[in-house]
Amino acid sequence: MAEQEEQLLKWMPAVVEYRQRLASLQGAWDNLALLSHLGDDGTNLSSTREAFETLANHLVTHLGTETHLKTVLACESRAQVAIDILVRNLFERTADVGFLAADDAIRKYCRDVPTLRAVIAEGGDEGDGARRTLQMATDAIQRRLAEYVAKYSVYHNVVLVAPSGEVLAQLAGGSAPARTQDSLIDATLASSMPYVESFAASDMVPDAKRALIYAHRVTFKGDTVAVLCLCFKLEDECGGIFHRLRNESDWSVLGLIDDQNRVIASTDPYQLPVGARVPDAAGKHGGIVRFAGREYLAITRNAKPYQGYAGPSWRGHVMVPVERAFESQDRSSQAQCPPEALADIRRNPAIFSVGLREIPRQADAIQRDLNRSVWNGSVRLSTGSAQNVAFAKALLREISNMGRKTKDVFERSIGELHETAVSSVLQDSEFVASLAIELFARNLYERANDCRWWALNGTLAGTLAGREGCDAKAASAVLTHINQLYTVYHSIVLFDVERRVVATSREDQQHLIGARIDESWAGDTLGLVDSQGYAVSKFGPSAFAADQATLIYSATVRGADRRAIGGVAVVFDACTQLKAMLVDALPHDEHGKLLAGCKAVLFDRDGRVMCATDSSLTESAETLETIGRNLTSNGATVRRIGGQYYALGTQTDTGYREYAGIGARAVVLLPLGAVPERGVEQRRPLPQCTATRNDHSRHDMREYTTFAAAGAWYALPTSCVIEAVDSKAVQTITTAGPPWAGVIIHGDGAVPVADLSKLLGLPNLEDPSVVILMRLPGRERPLGLLVEALGDNPEVPADRLLPVSVLEQRQESLLVEFAIQPVNVKDGLVLVVAAEKLVTQLFGGSGVGAGTSVPAPQERQVA
């Protein structure tokens, strides 16, 4: 284990608990290993003890790694989402400032103010008239700025500044001084970029230590007449983002930091104060940092560029007090995972590392070796002349019990971690669905803003009103310019009060001019009561989107008397944009590649599919439509879709800020593994072997060794058993047919091995892991029986041995001598195989395998 993760283990309660349990078991193994040297059964526990010790260390290592990784991934996700959502928001602001700076009313106002102020300075009647004109113009521009901020509510002030630094206008109640000294003005005047971004102290926002401002030159006929400054509500926006990423019981501290590691915004002013410089955690993948006298697990994530914009070099940052970072999380999400599904997922744990998945298999292998060793020890005690047999048998029983306890600890630790992991994936699916719907709502918020603002455009209103100098050609030019700036739209349309198309932004839609819009959204638009209202279409195909499915947002265009004279409709490029949102929300690897199997679907409020990230999902539309109709609440559950188990998270669109949303629902599918084929993945359960309980109070006792094959228990007299060995040593003989499985080298010779299931005419063995070597009456060479598992070595009273007639016509009766009556009536019989019948069956007489040639090993060829 890496040094850092070793240091973190002490803060992982679940791992500490299992480490203590394993240490306690290891001490018991040490004692048993010592005692085994005193017994006469020949059992050597050294290799078993060392194997369990090695596996225990591997388990602790993997548990620590998985626990650390789970916490790190959760923190990375939140840090990434925090900065990415903000960057998407700021990208819209970079477009806003350039478009607003080109607004005709703003340009004319900024051109006229210096002239009017010069006239006012001269005094006289002309000065008084100019003062009144300036006041009316300022009132009008303030109303226009207020209209803008009413729609784009992410700004707390809009300031127009003359090249000299004099403030020409701002929102009513704005706090900018009469003349600003902000260097942003000179920087903007000298820039030819589409926008200038500043995060620094500014006298235009005196209440903030640093303000985020977007600026652009305002020009009139090629001359710069002002600088437009949009003052962004950074603290307000960050608070909203952080609120959605945390819950009340969350110990993590979320923040944004700049490229100098200084805190820009934070959820906790005491643990992570704004302006403080934090230790660099970039690239440490969940390393420990010390800050303000406390240790934290810290994560820093760079912004992912959106449409080529990466933001102002800020990063998402998450810190969790290290003593709280790995506390057991709520596994209530398991309630949404049906028991059958959870059992299947455990058998096919695709969400675990290969190393962790191997531990249960390794534990099974060690347990099988131990069982075989104990079984052989019991056989030796029964057939030999060992002293102190009672002590040796008691020791073997304790060794067997200790093996089961150790294996149980391994199974429970893996099982509980698996349950936690499934719960974590369920929570992740719900989180990703929330992110997807957040991106969706924020995007459509901007669409509702755009159509309402553009409906106030003077050229568009003049065209509909028939004003001189305004016509369809001029309107189309305006719409085309807007569409070139805002590429999320397929087209933008202007229509009149008769719902007829007047202008469009696309050259290939000119044939639609003059056509009447019959869809209900056009009528809804004309019925809006004020400039804050907007209409939205149902999701579906439209001629304005080349007959592709789309959403259309529209707002009323009003004349001088405030009455509706038409509308502006923005036609969303839904197919492209919705899929991009869903893909961006899904988890990606460190190289930016979408994680395999992760999918997302967007439904409308009626459960119809709007968009899916994977074409295979849309091909199974019936299943998707069923899911869409049956989703009634937000949350997470496990569903089977197309032969796969998925963690299915869902979240409904409730809007963003004042935007109400359209009731859409995002559904995210994160893979949990394939659905196993029934009858293949499940092994036949063995009945309880209660016939094997020793009963020393009875006389005429007979000792047997028991074993399992093809879902049932069998027994042999202990006196004819030599030992059990691993079936891996069996050499297959291609020329030998059933029932022979091959040969095994034992001592100085080769021993033929017969498959018990083939001898008895039973189903194939599912796990042929053991070969029992036995003596046969009248034959020098031993025989090997291929079986599945070993049982106990009981002493059974003769009166519990039932005649073979109880088996009626069962195939096993050909080889069975007795049936041992079970202690528990509900349990199955244990069938005693007769060695004499085996000889007849295999080497003479009639029946399955009679007269077949005994296989011999082939010489190995040396390359």
Regions found by a protein language model. Give the residues of each.
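Extracellular/periplasmic juxtamembrane segments that couple receptor/chemosensory ectodomains to their
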Residues: 1-66, 220, 274-424, 620-690
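Extracytoplasmic/periplasmic sensory segments of membrane signal-transduction proteins
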Residues: 11, 15-193, 245, 375-531, ...
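Short hydrophobic alpha-helical segments used for membrane anchoring or interfacial signaling
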Residues: 102, 158-165, 253-260, 290, ...
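Solvent-exposed, extracytoplasmic
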Residues: 138-153, 183, 227-285, 322-350, ...
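Extracytoplasmic/periplasmic ligand-binding sensor regions of membrane-associated signaling proteins
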Residues: 142-232, 237, 285-299, 481-580, ...
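Short hydrophobic beta-strand segments that form the core of ligand-binding sensory/regulatory domains
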Residues: 213, 225-231, 313-319, 552, ...
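Glycine-rich acetyl-CoA-binding "A-motif" of GNAT/NAT acetyltransferases
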Residues: 224-225, 263, 501, 564-565, ...
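An acidic, low-aromatic, low-complexity terminal/linker signal
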Residues: 666, 673-863
